[in-house]
Amino acid sequence: MNNFKKVGLSALAGSLAAISANAAEMSVNGATMLTYTSEDNTETTGNPYGMKTNIGFTASGEVNGYTVSYMQTSKDQFAGMTSARMSIDMGDMGTLAFDQGSGSGLGTIDDKTPTAAEEIWDGLDGAGFTADSVGGLVGTAGASGVWNYVNTFEGVTFNGAIRKGSATKNADGASSGAGGSAWDFALTTDGSMIGVDGLAIGAGYGEDSGSTAAGVNEVDSTHMTAFANYSFGPATFGYQKSEINHGKQGTQSEETDAWGIAFNINENLSV
C-alpha cells in the first residue's frame, strides 16, 4: 500500500546527490505478515507466533536531466535500516547506483527457481551449514557498499557490481576496516532471442580477493551460477546450478542444484 503520497521536498542536495534537485516526490510503503514457527524435537518452541513489520521510503526527482531515485527500507520492527539505494537513470547509457543492501550484480540471480511465495530456504536457521550454504549461494560483491551498473544490450541485461574493501553499510563520512575487494555480474534474457516463448535464462560470475589484513594471504574465491525457467500456461518450471570455489586454505568448495515448480491456480492462489 502507498500512503502519504506526494510529500513535497524542496531540495535533495544532501539526500540524492552532491548537486541540488528542484523537486521530488516521496512515498511511504509498508508490509506486515503474521508467522507461526515450530521447531523440531531437538529445539525449544516457546511462543511460536511472530509478526513482520517493515516500512520503506522511496523518492525520485530530476537532476540535470537525469532521474535520480532513492529508497530505504527498515529492518523488522524498525530495528534500524536493512537496505538503501541511490541511483541515477541515464537513459540509453544505463543506470548507475550505490547500493547498501538492496541487491546487485550476481546476487540478483542467486536463486531464480520458481516459488509461490518466498524462496524454499526462507525460514531455515542454518544450523550445520556455512554462511553461504543456506539462502542465496552466490554473490561475491555482496549488497553493501557496492557500486552497481545496469544496462540492456540487444535484449541481454547486464547487471554488474564492484566493491572496494569490506561489504559494510558505512554512514556518511565513515570508512570500513580491512577487507577484500570483489566484483561480479549477471547476464539475463528471455526466450525471444531464440524463438522460445516463456523461457527465461541467465548466468553470472564473480571473484572475491579475500582479506587484505596484514599477515593474511588469501587466494581469490570464485562464484558462478546459471538458471533456466520455462513458463507454460499457469505453470512454471525451473532449474539452477551454483558453485563457489573458496580460495582460503582448508575450506571446501560448495555446490547447489535447485529446481522448482510453481502453479497459479487463480489470481489469489499459487502453489
Which residues fall in each region the model found?
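Outer-membrane beta-barrel proteins
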Residues: 1-271
